[in-house]
């Protein structure tokens, strides 16, 4: 259980670094109590929706009879990790700045939409393979851990928005942290499902 919690924390942290920077932008510009509450609600709405969508995909994929074939899903986070290393991470920060410039009144929807636009594909590509490796008990622990991490992510962004230099440092090094988490998760999924033999057979 402890290993499951630690893995979930690392995984969510890897997918949440981009969002941390984006949320810091919102908190730097929107400082009223109502706006702060709406940022929290928007982030929960966007993130929980992505997690729910990932669960649906994982549920369908669990009907694949071969564990080794299912394990090949680990290639998705490996691909995403290599993409981050070579091309950089998402353009969510630019989308957030554009949304703030337009002074969008529906802040909840704006934050949720940016969560989807900036992290949707990556999060689903990482969460789905991981969810397929979990039994029901570990899945429940993971989901509860994710909910706590969503809150901690927004809370951290709210506090760090008061220290501009932190945002610059995160932006500079985030791609390396994200890439390591994605690549590590992909390797873990391949190993956990004994998929390397099948992979070598296909490549050979």
Regions found by a protein language model. Give the residues of each.
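Interfacial loop-to-transmembrane junctions
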Residues: 158-180
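Core segments of transmembrane alpha-helices
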Residues: 51, 116-126, 178, 182
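Final/C-terminal transmembrane alpha-helix of multipass membrane proteins
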Residues: 175-193
């Amino acid at each position: 259980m402890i290993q499951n919690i630690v893995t979930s924390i690392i995984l969510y942290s890897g997918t949440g670094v981009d969002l941390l920077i984006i949320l810091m932008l919102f908190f730097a510009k929107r400082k009223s109590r109502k706006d702060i509450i709406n940022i929290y609600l928007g982030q929960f709405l966007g993130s929980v929706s992505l997690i729910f969508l990932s669960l649906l995909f994982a549920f369908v994929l669990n009907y694949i009879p071969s564990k080794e074939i299912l394990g090949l899903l680990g290639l998705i986070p490996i691909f995403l990790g290599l993409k981050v290393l070579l091309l950089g991470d998402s353009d969510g920060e630019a989308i957030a700045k554009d949304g703030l410039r337009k002074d969008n009144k529906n802040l909840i929807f704006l934050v949720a939409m940016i969560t989807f636009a900036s992290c949707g594909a990556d999060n689903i590509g990482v969460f789905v393979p991981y969810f397929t490796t979990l039994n029901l008990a570990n899945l429940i622990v993971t989901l509860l851990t994710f909910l706590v991490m969503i809150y901690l992510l927004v809370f951290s962004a709210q506090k760090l928005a008061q220290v501009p230099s932190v945002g610059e440092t995160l932006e500079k090094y985030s791609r390396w942290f994200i890439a390591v988490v994605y690549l590590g998760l992909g390797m873990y999924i391949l190993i956990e499902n004994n998929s390397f033999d099948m992979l070598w057979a296909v490549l050979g």
